[in-house]
Amino acid sequence: MAYYDEGEGDPIIFLHGNPSSSYLWRNIAPNFFQSNRVIVPDLIGMGDSEKLDGVNNKDYNFSGHYKFLCEFLLSISIKKNIHLVIHDWGCGLGLKFARLNSNAIKSGTITLLD
């Protein structure tokens, strides 16, 4: 998964919609660099993230995206005090993550962006 990761402090995870990319957050995320660790991934198959093999790959569904998101967060040691900022397709992924990992979540924000 392609992503950028900048700053220190409690992590803020920005999740974009579908079809979109981390570019959605280009004017918002930098406002938090001085106070938080800001992580902005490109979900699988979007933005600069790798495309999966095969046109009909079964991981291009909600369950597949959720699996990749969880593996990604573990790989960069995101485990507690998480602030989620979610939009569109990222809302479903983020809300499921929050429901199943409520002890790790500090806050959540659902956004409506054009």
PLM feature segments, named:
Residues 1:
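Glycine-rich phosphate/pyrophosphate-binding loop shared by adenosine-nucleotide-utilizing enzymes
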Residues 29-33, 55-58, 100-103:
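Glycine-rich, phosphate-binding/catalytic loops in enzymes
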Residues 26, 70, 95-99:
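Short, hydrophobic alpha-helix immediately C-terminal to the catalytic nucleophile
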Residues 40-85:
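Active-site loop/oxyanion-hole signature of alpha/beta-hydrolase fold enzymes
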Residues 4-51, 72:
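Conserved HGGG/HGGXW glycine-rich cap/lid loop of the alpha/beta-hydrolase fold
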Residues 5-10, 63-66, 70, 89, ...:
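A general secondary-structure boundary signal
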Residues 35, 79-114:
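Conserved hydrolase catalytic core segment
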